[in-house]
């Protein structure tokens, strides 16, 4: 498992608990897909974002006839968490009803980078019965645009 490879010293008991927690977060992302408003693409996406203190916020995609005004599941989850006062996050799970290994798009990755460190764990659903593919935000979005990037000298 990728998580074990990164930490190297996690006990089997802790790894099993982490796997259960990851599956639980993925289930939250899968469950919220049913609330998606997708009359045009019929492509449902769900996201579950866990705060540093363990609270979970979910989001689904909301399409608009003018596609540029559509909201992505990750954006909705982030907005819910931020409006509730959260600014530190530990994990994100993303799931789609149409394809396995769905990852956040570039725009969502940049939005996540506004609030999350490069080590945010991103769990990408591989479908029922499969282990999720795990990335860090830094792996998905290297060389992010940040406040430091925009500072003038």
Describe these PLM feature segments.
Residues 53-64, 88-92:
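Glycine/charged-rich beta-loop-alpha catalytic/anionic-binding loops adjacent to active sites
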């Amino acid at each position: 498992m990728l998580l074990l490879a990164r930490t190297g010293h996690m006990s089997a008991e802790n790894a099993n608990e982490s796997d259960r927690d990851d599956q639980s977060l993925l289930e939250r992302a899968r469950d919220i897909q049913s609330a998606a408003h997708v009359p045009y693409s019929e492509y449902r996406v769900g996201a579950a974002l866990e705060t540093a203190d363990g609270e979970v916020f979910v989001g689904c995609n909301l399409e608009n006839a003018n596609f540029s005004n559509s909201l992505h599941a990750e954006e909705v989850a982030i907005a819910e968490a931020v409006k509730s006062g959260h600014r530190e996050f530990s994990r994100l799970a993303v799931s789609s009803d149409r394809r396995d290994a769905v990852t956040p798009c570039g725009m969502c990755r940049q939005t996540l980078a506004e609030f999350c460190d490069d080590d945010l764990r991103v769990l990408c659903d591989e479908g029922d019965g499969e282990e999720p593919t795990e990335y860090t935000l830094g792996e998905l979005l290297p060389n992010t645009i940040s406040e430091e990037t925009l500072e003038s000298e």
